[in-house]
Amino acid sequence: MPSIKLLVWCCLCVISPRLCHSEKLFHSRDRSDLQPSAIEQAELVKDMLSAQQFLAKYGWTQPVIWDPSSTNENEPLKDFSLMQEGVCNPRQEVAEPTKSPQFIDALKKFQKLNNLPVTGTLDDATINAMNKPRCGVPDNQMAKKETEKPTAAQSLENKTKDSENVTQQNPDPPKIRRKRFLDMLMYSNKYREEQEALQKSTGKVFTKKLLKWRMIGEGYSNQLSINEQRYVFRLAFRMWSEVMPLDFEEDNTSPLSQIDIKLGFGRGRHLGCSRAFDGSGQEFAHAWFLGDIHFDDDEHFTAPSSEHGISLLKVAAHEIGHVLGLSHIHRVGSIMQPNYIPQDSGFELDLSDRRAIQNLYGSCEGPFDTAFDWIYKEKNQYGELVVRYNTYFFRNSWYWMYENRSNRTRYGDPLAIANGWHGIPVQNIDAFVHVWTWTRDASYFFKGTQYWRYDSENDKAYAEDAQGKSYPRLISEGFPGIPSPINAAYFDRRRQYIYFFRDSQVFAFDINRNRVAPDFPKRILDFFPAVAANNHPKGNIDVAYYSYTYSSLFLFKGKEFWKVVSDKDRRQNPSLPYNGLFPRRAISQQWFDICNVHPSLLKI
């Protein structure tokens, strides 16, 4: 009797998956206890036939339909009952690749973009270029509007109609094997996810400002710990976030349908994907626009600190570029090159990568709390004392160092104010002033009704002044006659005045007499007249920034700035008004790539 009950239970498990505690489609199990399977080696290009297959596969012969839902004609047949004996047809002569104009033309295009001699012949240099490790995404893809194949929605609709017809003709539904049930479930899930992705996009880019990503549970690699894998992916997403107005957040709790980008590792036929990996040595990974990223676990991926193997960080950054909408860029230094170029862990996104992604998503914009040039003295290699400066931008609780020679922020910024500037308020600084003369050298941060003096040598705020008075101090005590809170401030070395901005007024504070200068305050509109009519911030300035790079003063308000007419400008054009304001411009047009990152990525 017990054996009969056991048999019935087993049958129910096969027929009804819900009765069984089966393994989830996506789970979080660490597979480090499993023995890795033998690594397969990718087939190399070595002759005309394999070269022809390579050119066709990557879109050089003609653009390729790159669609995760496309069927793979080479997929092994699962139902052998459908096999039929083939019909014998007369043998047809196949043209040799070397005589095909299409093959020669494709070969020439490949050679040209890979900086090879354009010969149209399959020489050793061309074969070597084809055998370089690369991304699995085709170099030339067919535009969606050019494809005539049914979409995933149409395919699923047709499958549904066929199923309805069968149900109507056969009242008793056929028994579905459990494997086929899972296949249909995964297909419908993928269709739903694709439809949601279409709703998120305009057809070209994500329209959401916050994208969520996740490593799918089945797709962890055996080669690195789970924490190492997640760290690398967080860093790769941060690299893109530093140069574009999108945030990325790892989300391991929301339903899978709400995840924008899913990442995973696999070998050969993997993760329900229609594109099989080829083994070690050639394709490292592939990705889909607004979709998933898969990594070939036959490859030897390593952490950024390793000098050996394949940098998972570099491959991940490349594939994320595809998901965001970038194609391959045939430019030395670009992360979007199709071929993997071994490089140290210090690589960063090239100018071409940054401009390409900003062409899709726009540049980073936003107001700032303060901006300033930090002046300091140090000895050079000859022991001589030299004066240098670094440029900083503050926003909320973050700061960026701006590298003026490269016209971009320092790689790895922003950083938390609390970590870089010790003893001052950790967010929403109102202004910074550096009083720098032959006899004085003092730096001040202002917030609310108080100010802090900063010790640049010890990199922290002073606890007290020379008279033993503690910091922070009231602005009204240290700068008599100046109201608080202030909007912005800067120091004019020529006149030795600190100019404080509050609402629609500007105050000139004489540092030698420790008082407000005569005839002040004045209206900002009068003290800084507009060069062009009706083009003036009028009041509530965010930042007053004197730049030593441009030898000019800039007034920031919101996302825009006004450059103050300099002495050099007046020498070139005497008709310009003294302290006049040139017409507004976007801050992002003068200072590039000052981008926020998601708080979860701030500590990387």
From Swiss-Prot:
Keyword DNA damage annotated: no
GO BP field: collagen catabolic process; determination of heart left/right asymmetry; determination of left/right symmetry; extracellular matrix organization; proteolysis
CC annotations in GO: extracellular matrix; extracellular region
Enzyme class: hydrolase
Taxonomic source organism: Xenopus laevis (African clawed frog)
Region of interest called Disordered, as start-end residue ranges on this chain: 132-175
InterPro entries named among the record's database cross-references: Hemopexin-like_dom_sf, Hemopexin-like_repeat, M10A_MMP, MetalloPept_cat_dom_sf, Pept_M10_metallopeptidase, Pept_M10A, Peptidase_Metallo, Peptidoglycan-bd-like
Active site: 319
UniProt repeat feature Hemopexin, residue ranges: 365-424, 426-482, 483-531, 538-594
Cofactor: Zn(2+); Ca(2+)
PANTHER family from the UniProt entry: MATRIX METALLOPROTEINASE (PTHR10201), MATRIX METALLOPROTEINASE-21 (PTHR10201:SF324)
Protein's recorded name: Matrix metalloproteinase-21
